[in-house]
Amino acid sequence: MDSIISAASVIAAGLAIGLAAIGPGIGQGNAAGQAVEGIARQPEGENKIRGTLLLSLAFMEALTIYGLVVALALLFANPFNG
């Protein structure tokens, strides 16, 4: 029974980190592309656009870090293992 729980935990950890990285990865790509496009259209707003971009990228990256925390909890502090 413990081997099944361990195997399921490893699979769940892989899915957690993989799925947690898909959304923010796509979002970061779109945000960076739109920021470059906005700076190209209005070069005088570069500082404001860059600041907003960096803040939004940090929030998006936090989602991936939450997935990493869940994966590490499943691997090393598994509440289902006795």
Curated annotation (Swiss-Prot):
It holds the Pfam family ATP-synt_C. One of its GO terms (molecular function) is lipid binding. The record marks E61 as: Reversibly protonated during proton transport. The chain crosses the membrane at residues 4-24, 57-77. It is found in: Plastid, Chloroplast thylakoid membrane. SUPFAM superfamilies: F1F0 ATP synthase subunit C. InterPro entries: ATP_synth_csu_bac/chlpt, ATP_synth_F0_csu, ATP_synth_F0_csu_DDCD_BS, ATP_synth_F0_csu_sf, ATPase_proteolipid_c-like_dom, F/V-ATP_Csub_sf. GO terms for cellular component: chloroplast thylakoid membrane; proton-transporting ATP synthase complex; proton-transporting two-sector ATPase complex, proton-transporting domain. It is a multi-pass membrane protein. It comes from the Eukaryota. Its main location: plastid. Keywords: ATP synthesis, CF(0), Chloroplast, Hydrogen ion transport, Ion transport, Lipid-binding, Membrane, Plastid, Thylakoid, Transmembrane, Transmembrane helix, Transport. PANTHER family: ATP SYNTHASE LIPID-BINDING PROTEIN, MITOCHONDRIAL (PTHR10031), ATPASE PROTEIN 9 (PTHR10031:SF0). F(1)F(0) ATP synthase produces ATP from ADP in the presence of a proton or sodium gradient. F-type ATPases consist of two structural domains, F(1) containing the extramembraneous catalytic core and F(0) containing the membrane proton channel, linked together by a central stalk and a peripheral stalk. During catalysis, ATP synthesis in the catalytic domain of F(1) is coupled via a rotary mechanism of the central stalk subunits to proton translocation. NCBIfam families: ATP_synt_c, PRK07354.1. F-type ATPases have 2 components, F(1) - the catalytic core - and F(0) - the membrane proton channel. F(1) has five subunits: alpha(3), beta(3), gamma(1), delta(1), epsilon(1). F(0) has four main subunits: a(1), b(1), b'(1) and c(10-14). The alpha and beta chains form an alternating ring which encloses part of the gamma chain. F(1) is attached to F(0) by a central stalk formed by the gamma and epsilon chains, while a peripheral stalk is formed by the delta, b and b' chains. In plastids the F-type ATPase is also known as CF(1)CF(0). Belongs to the ATPase C chain family. This is ATP synthase subunit c, chloroplastic. The gene is atpH.
